[in-house]
């Protein structure tokens, strides 16, 4: 019930979408702060020119930072398990996941360019208070889980490179230095940061490319696996692995990150042509970055498909025991079960098969993947916290707290885990948690980019909206199957387990449906006059569109001249 007190504005609970004067002031301060940060200038030349390498270079950066999420240790582990279990048969799934990811990243970049705000900032103004707080918490959980994977990957890489001399918990402590590295590089501007990420991607390309060249997998089978959308002779194990590949590639927090990174370019939003140009070049740059990340992932799949497909633990163990320069040569159990592999065992196998150099180069690649991913995770945490809760802390505080939240549970895990193989097994659980969080990025990005009030004449076309909705529904359905299988296979399906999970599942589904309702209204599939108890669609929020004001002024001037 609305308050009758006239001394102040209506409380947000009464009209949760209402933007008060204080909200406008906060937004103005945020925009002023953003403008004061270093932005990359875009060359001013003929905007009608179809293509310019100079302009592409100016826009290059955000897409490569975004592509790091496709190369994190969780993805690498999913790749090698895919190769060991299904050979080259799931490469088409990997390719499809990258294509879908490209389309989603395109939406994210367009949102940042057109609205001048990133996803968290738009969500803050678009959703009522309680839903946006829940949304923020869900994305923070996704960021923490992702960061845990990167910290674990980096610690394992250090453990592998030192031949076990550096304990895992020390490796985790070493990753804290990422925080200070990030702060140091960030002081010198976004271009320097992008250069460092470019170097790390190059390191991964060389490392995993080296393994590909040494192993020499059959190119014909690799190409066939990419273009033939089928998995002959596959069962439930291969199907679950395919789901894992999709879940590892499409990361929820990455959509929030990309929409913020594109704001590092100085785009004149008063000129429609400049906005369209930015959308074009960011899409092209993202496509190039994800094309490269796909081939890096392909290298990993092919290496382990060629070496470990249809091999048993005993086969690999026998090969490793014969070598004396490889640590943990007896890590593979002496049984005839299909070989089980993770990022640590993968390095041991490469050392056993091709020598210590191959093992060290693999470790360097995993280290680069972990380092780059922890830094992008920190960046994402900063943007999400700023956008959702408007915390005006010094940057070093925000970064330290974001890292501490991720490192603390990882430290506990390393202290109590019995061996490195148990630690790497956490990746499956962390991937599962991130799949649970995926709707809280997928649904909002479709909602925002389909909204006339946010994107105006740059909103997604009806065909693209329908494609995005169908694709997202398919991904979410597959995720539900994977999550339910994962949970019940580990916890069991006894009545008391179901009783505990039922209320949590009900609340989760209810919130997803709430977000989906907003999405359908934005897509104009259902009218904004919909009346459902407890649901009020935001009719008053409208993002600025300075190019429309300029267009209107030009039309008015021309009419006056005539």
Swiss-Prot record:
Expressed in dopaminergic neurons (at protein level). Expressed predominantly in anterior and posterior intestine, rectal gland cell, H-shaped excretory cell, vulva cells, proximal uterus and spermatheca in adults. Weakly expressed in hyp7 hypodermis, pharyngeal muscles and some anterior sensory, ring and posterior head neurons in adults. Expressed in the anchor cell at the larval stage. One of its GO terms (cellular component) is apical plasma membrane. The keyword Membrane applies. Pfam families: Nramp. Induction: Induced by pathogenic bacterium S.aureus. Repressed by high levels of Mn(2+). Residues 1-55, 105-140, 186-194, 263-287, 369-398, 450-462, 518-562 are cytoplasmic. Keywords: Cell membrane, Cytoplasmic vesicle, Glycoprotein, Ion transport, Membrane, Transmembrane, Transmembrane helix, Transport. The chain crosses the membrane at residues 56-76, 84-104, 141-161, 165-185, 195-215, 242-262, 288-308, 348-368, 399-419, 429-449, 463-483, 497-517. Residues 77-83, 162-164, 216-241, 309-347, 420-428, 484-496 are extracellular. Disruption phenotype: Higher iron levels in their body compared to wild-type. Increased survival rate and reduced iron levels in their body in response to increasing Mn(2+) levels. Reduced survival rate in response to high Mn(2+) levels or to infection mediated by pathogenic bacterium S.aureus. Increased smf-2 mRNA levels. RNAi-mediated knockdown increases resistance to Mn(2+)-induced CEP neuron death and prevents CEP neuron death-mediated by the neurotoxin 6-hydroxy dopamine (6-OHDA). One of its GO terms (molecular function) is cadmium ion transmembrane transporter activity. It is found in: Apical cell membrane; Cytoplasmic vesicle membrane. It is a multi-pass membrane protein. Belongs to the NRAMP family. Probable divalent metal ion transporter which regulates Mn(2+) uptake. This is NRAMP-like transporter smf-1.
């Amino acid at each position: 019930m609305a308050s009758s007190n006239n001394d102040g504005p209506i409380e947000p609970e009464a009209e949760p979408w209402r933007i008060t004067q204080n909200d406008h002031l906060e937004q103005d301060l945020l925009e002023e702060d953003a403008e004061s940060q270093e932005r990359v200038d875009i060359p001013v030349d003929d905007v009608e020119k179809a293509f310019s390498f100079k302009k592409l270079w100016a826009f290059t950066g955000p897409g490569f930072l975004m592509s790091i999420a496709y190369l994190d240790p969780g993805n690498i582990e999913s790749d090698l398990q895919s190769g060991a279990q299904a050979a080259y048969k799931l490469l088409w799934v990997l390719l499809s996941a990258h294509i879908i990811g490209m389309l989603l990243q395109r939406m994210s970049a367009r949102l940042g360019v057109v609205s001048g705000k990133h996803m968290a900032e738009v969500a803050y103004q678009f959703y009522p208070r309680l839903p946006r707080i829940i949304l923020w918490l869900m994305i923070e959980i996704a960021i923490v889980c992702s960061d845990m994977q990167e910290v674990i990957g980096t610690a394992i890489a250090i453990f592998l490179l030192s031949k076990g001399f550096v304990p895992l918990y020390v490796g985790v402590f070493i990753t804290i230095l990422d925080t200070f590295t990030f702060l140091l590089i960030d002081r010198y501007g976004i271009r320097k940061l992008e250069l460092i990420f470019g170097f790390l991607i190059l390191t991964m390309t060389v490392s995993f490319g080296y393994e590909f060249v040494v192993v020499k997998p059959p190119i014909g089978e690799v190409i066939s696996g990419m273009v033939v959308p089928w998995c002959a002779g596959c069962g439930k194990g291969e199907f679950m692995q395919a789901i894992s590949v999709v879940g590892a590639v499409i990361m929820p927090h990455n959509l929030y990150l990309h929409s913020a990174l594109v704001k590092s370019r100085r785009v004149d939003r008063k000129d429609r042509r400049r906005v369209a140009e930015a959308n074009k070049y960011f899409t092209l740059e993202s496509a190039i970055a994800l094309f490269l990340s796909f081939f890096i992932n392909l290298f990993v799949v092919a290496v382990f498909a060629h070496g470990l497909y249809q091999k048993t633990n005993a086969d690999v163990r026998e090969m490793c025991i014969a070598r004396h320069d490889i640590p943990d040569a007896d890590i593979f159990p002496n049984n005839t079960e299909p070989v089980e592999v993770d990022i640590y065992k993968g390095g041991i196998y490469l050392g056993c098969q091709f020598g210590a150099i191959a093992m060290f180069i693999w470790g360097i690649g995993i280290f680069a993947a972990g380092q780059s991913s922890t830094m992008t995770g920190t960046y994402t945490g900063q943007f999400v916290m700023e956008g959702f809760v408007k915390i005006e802390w010094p940057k070093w505080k925000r970064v330290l707290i974001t890292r501490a939240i991720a490192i603390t549970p990882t430290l506990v895990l390393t202290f109590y885990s019995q061996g490195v193989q148990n630690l790497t097994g956490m990746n499956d659980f962390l991937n599962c948690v991130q799949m649970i969080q995926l709707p809280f990025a997928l649904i909002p990005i479709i909602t925002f980019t389909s909204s006339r009030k946010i994107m105006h004449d740059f909103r997604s076309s009806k065909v693209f909206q329908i494609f995005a909705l169908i694709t997202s529904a398919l991904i979410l359905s597959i995720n539900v199957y994977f999550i339910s299988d994962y949970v019940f296979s580990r916890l069991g399906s006894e009545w008391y387990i179901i009783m505990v999970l039922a209320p949590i599942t009900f609340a989760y589904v209810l919130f997803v449906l709430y977000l989906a309702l907003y999405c359908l209204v934005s897509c104009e599939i259902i009218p904004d006059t919909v009346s459902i108890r407890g649901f009020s669609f935001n009719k008053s929020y409208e993002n600025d569109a300075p190019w429309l004001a300029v267009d209107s002024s030009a039309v008015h001037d021309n009419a006056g001249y005539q």
